[in-house]
């Protein structure tokens, strides 16, 4: 709720909202469990509130939404070295994004920072190994 209120009143170019609930439910209850999916449903409602706040602030046409996670999970684990633990969802939405686009190639977490740098027109530092996911843009 506080995020939506902040969005409506603050002047901002970049907002990162971190929600840690799934990071607690996964290791405690297990990934791919009813309680984990219930928490995802709750978080989906929060995302809806944030989108509505952006609309109410009159900034929808100027906003890019990115929803992702810092890691995946297996059973009651908390990240790890398997692909299932390293790959996460990466959802990006904006009027300049191809609607319904699905990545055919592997996308890793470090590609998120590269994509954000690309969005803001920033030069990626040479030491970064990420690739900007420019194929999602129209």
Where does each model-flagged region fall?
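Soluble non-cytosolic domains of exported or imported proteins
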Residues: 34-44, 103-110, 127
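Solvent-exposed loop/turn segments at secondary-structure junctions
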Residues: 21-25, 71-74, 96-98
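Substrate-binding rim/cap in mid-to-C-terminal beta-strand-loop elements of soluble/periplasmic
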Residues: 81-123, 134
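Active-site His/acidic residue clusters
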Residues: 3-45, 49
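Active-site-proximal alpha/beta segments of enzymes that process anionic O-linked groups
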Residues: 1-9, 112, 118, 131-136
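Loop/turn elements at helix/coil->beta-strand transitions in domains of secreted/extracellular proteins
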Residues: 9-15, 59-65, 88, 95
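…; additionally, a secondary subgroup of soluble metalloenzymes is captured
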Residues: 121-129, 138
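Metal-dependent active-site segment of extracytoplasmic phospho-/sulfohydrolases and closely related
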Residues: 39-83, 90, 116
């Amino acid at each position: 709720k506080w995020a939506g209120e902040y969005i409506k009143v603050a002047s901002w170019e970049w907002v990162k909202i971190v929600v840690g609930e799934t990071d607690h439910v996964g290791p405690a209850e297990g990934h791919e469990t009813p309680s984990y999916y219930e928490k995802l449903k709750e978080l989906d409602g929060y995302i809806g509130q944030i989108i509505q706040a952006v609309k109410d602030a009159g900034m929808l046409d100027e906003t890019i939404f990115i929803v992702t996670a810092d890691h995946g999970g297996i059973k009651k684990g908390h990240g790890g070295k398997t692909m299932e633990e390293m790959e996460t969802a990466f959802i990006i939405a904006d009027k300049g994004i191809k609607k319904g686009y699905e990545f055919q190639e592997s996308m890793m977490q470090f590609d998120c920072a590269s994509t954000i740098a690309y969005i803001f027109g920033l030069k990626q530092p040479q030491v970064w190994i990420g690739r900007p996911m420019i194929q999602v843009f129209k």
